Amino acid sequence: MESAIAEGGASRFSASSGGGGSRGAPQHYPKTAGNSEFLGKTPGQNAQKWIPARSTRRDDNSAANNSANEKERHDAIFRKVRGILNKLTPEKFDKLCLELLNVGVESKLILKGVILLIVDKALEEPKYSSLYAQLCLRLAEDAPNFDGPAAEGQPGQKQSTTFRRLLISKLQDEFENRTRNVDVYDKRENPLLPEEEEQRAIAKIKMLGNIKFIGELGKLDLIHESILHKCIKTLLEKKKRVQLKDMGEDLECLCQIMRTVGPRLDHERAKSLMDQYFARMCSLMLSKELPARIRFLLQDTVELREHHWVPRKAFLDNGPKTINQIRQDAVKDLGVFIPAPMAQGRSDFFLEGPFMPPRMKMDRDPLGGLADMFGQMPGSGIGTGPGVIQDRFSPTMGRHRSNQLFNGHGGHIMPPTQSQFGEMGGKFMKSQGLSQLYHNQSQGLLSQLQGQSKDMPPRFSKKGQLNADEISLRPAQSFLMNKNQVPKLQPQITMIPPSAQPPRTQTPPLGQTPQLGLKTNPPLIQEKPAKTSKKPPPSKEELLKLTEAVVTDYLNSGNANDAVSGVREMRAPKHFLPEMLSKVIILSLDRSDEDKEKASSLISLLKQEGIATSDNFMQAFLNVLEQCPKLEVDIPLVKSYLAQFAARAIISELVSISELAQPLESGTHFPLFLLCLQQLAKLQDREWLTELFQQSKVNMQKMLPEIDQNKDRMLEILEGKGLSFLFPLLKLEKELLKQIKLDPSPQTIYKWIKDNISPKLHVDKGFVNILMTSFLQYISSEVSPPSDETDSSSAPSKEQLEQEKQLLLSFKPVMQKFLHDHVDLQVSALYALQVHCYNSSFPKGMLLRFFVHFYDMEIIEEEAFLAWKEDITQEFPGKGKALFQVNQWLTWLETAEEEESEEEAD
């Protein structure tokens, strides 16, 4: 990752001064004393002031006391922040976010400490990265900004704040030093001690956790997409003096970031980049120099993309869950129903069902921390073995509504279990004929549980009982820890098959004391659901008729609420929604413009109500487009009417321009896309449309038929449709070259540019490309007129070379005016030169000559040349041949720059 990742500065602070860890880990707070990076060297209003030597001892003591009080206050704040982070769960997220914002973030110093604690927690608990990323998103929006008002950034880009700048700076520091802590142990010649193995495992978790955290922040747009690409390039590129076998850590980080944020990066505009990344990964995957584990990681990542980023089942559910989700998973995976706490106000005496509610405690001791999450576990008692203390209710009490120990009511008590009395107890129960009760149900449940246990993780099939004191709501410190050290807080859950449990009876056997064993799960009693006469779902034909009736009534009456209610009552399945929206569009096509607008409003309203989605609309829109040949027989202007629907959908933010453009590329349904833009300009205004279109990054040439995909033809088509205002630079290209030919003096050219081109475009890459192309075309036409039949493979004469140099020198002031201190614009100028040489079939030595002239005349800086070399975009043709011609010169430039920097360092 390059310096661009730290958008707001290069401040750093030590990763060792934070911490997070799981509950029970030793508390380490950000130190303020003796940490020059964290406090002493921090510039700004909180920096320590110089005190003159003549100050009195009293002043010194007062300053020392104030400093000590300040440090104590900071430590208290950081302790509070750590406590909040330890309690962070999906359910308490909003509440704890507010608490965190109110801890007293009054200075940049405190904000740095908060960021340090959050990042360390995210690195130590990678499973919760998404939760900490959401927390960072909230803080980036709501935390105080100490940088003052920021300059306007690019449209659609998140505003840079102090929190975001410091967060990115911290992550950059972690990224650049990602393998440092792991390499310390890998370079040891002697075998590692158990403590060192554990420290190495923790360091590796943090390394991968940082990469995953960067990916999660990228999903939320807190880290720009270009930064994510720089991370990937850094991890993937071949380092100098580094063998392939030593790239294992970087490639593991690469696989982690691809799994996390790969789906977001893999879109149409970045497809060529992603293809290059994965081509490189495929080649590395076949290399025998890499360890087998790394090769398999690469293979898994490549296959993940081939399967459209749909992960295997093992990776689907790997994030933080709410308590309700945990209960549902217990029912689905373990076959155990864990009841939620009952609502207040319901009569406990009349409860029905296999389990009593946890709020009916009857002087019982609580289960502890687990009771808050799962409610009271059924069938639990106090003590073990014979003579245990009976619980005040049995799981079947709600059904029989009586218990010998409940309010003095006479009732029935459970018999002793087989597990309590061992083999003899089991034989005694069989002799009484009790084991036949519920035999069929038990056998069915047993086979079901045995089938489920095959897919059950090993930790759930171990022997042992559920102990509330052994439950931890957070994962173990590390899944890579020393295997000999079993974490103390490891949860253990044992499934007891129904066949091992006693049958229920209403009276105990003669001579036996009623007892209840500890931690035995009762059998599941499946009640037959009450028979209800459900109507079968409506058929497709019925749904279409209902849709037609609702839409016709709405278009006639204009009552949108009734229409939405009618759609709800249809209870249409999700897969039918696109067809329903298609029907809405088609029914309004042959009606008035007012009715078409009503239909568009109805679709937008269905989206707002959560009934339909943007994808549903796009599917419906494309369905209608496929029917256009048939519809055009009765409705000749059907494409214009559909353009109105698309335009209104964009205005109401139902879809974006880029989403609409994607299925219409390469001239599909041409000129529908241009008709949509016309309608947008008509319904809104040109400036609004121009800004929206530029934000969409749609390539207009790709929207035309393949035969028309060139600049001249595109300008001609856009002028015919009245849309040339979207591309002011296209007209500029022809007019600027005419102006240069008319008067090539730099003063005249600069004045013409100022008078005719908006200042906003002066820093636009497209403008720089056109400016350089115009200069190069003029120089080529003057040095080698078109009438001359010169061979591009022959070298130019001395006079031509001198004339070329003088013309370039005359344009130098104009070039420097627009390129100075703008490396990105200088790279665009080099691409303009590359394309000019490509269009001229690469005349002998031309590219190298201009590279040398640009360097000697200080038009282009060294950094821009090297950035052009490393850039792998395929937007401009001829890059491969261009690199071949100037590669030796670029190598010289790179080594010269390194030698110069070494001399400066000496």
UniProtKB/Swiss-Prot annotation:
The modification Phosphoserine is found at residues 11, 394, 442, 901. Residues 542-665 form the MI domain. The modification Phosphothreonine is found at residues 89, 507, 513. Residues 502-515 have a biased composition (Polar residues). Keywords: Acetylation, Initiation factor, Isopeptide bond, Methylation, Phosphoprotein, Protein biosynthesis, Repressor, Translation regulation, Ubl conjugation. Residues 1-71, 497-540 are annotated as: Disordered. The modification N6-methyllysine is found at residue 430. GO terms for biological process: regulation of translational initiation. The keyword Phosphoprotein applies. It holds the Pfam family MA3. Residues 78-308 form the MIF4G domain. Phosphorylation; hyperphosphorylated during mitosis. Ubiquitously expressed in all tissues examined. The modification Omega-N-methylarginine is found at residues 359, 504. It comes from the Eukaryota. The modification N-acetylmethionine is found at residue 1. One of its GO terms (cellular component) is postsynaptic density. Gene3D superfamilies: 1.25.40.180. Residues 719-903 form the W2 domain. There is a cross-link at residue 574 (Glycyl lysine isopeptide (Lys-Gly) (interchain with G-Cter in SUMO2)). Belongs to the eukaryotic initiation factor 4G family. Appears to play a role in the switch from cap-dependent to IRES-mediated translation during mitosis, apoptosis and viral infection. Cleaved by some caspases and viral proteases. Interacts with the serine/threonine protein kinases MKNK1 and MKNK2. Binds EIF4A and EIF3. Interacts with MIF4GD. Interacts with DAZAP2. This gene has been shown to be extensively edited in the liver of APOBEC1 transgenic animals. Its aberrant editing could contribute to the potent oncogenesis induced by overexpression of APOBEC1. The aberrant edited sequence, called NAT1, is likely to be a fundamental translational repressor. This is Eukaryotic translation initiation factor 4 gamma 2.
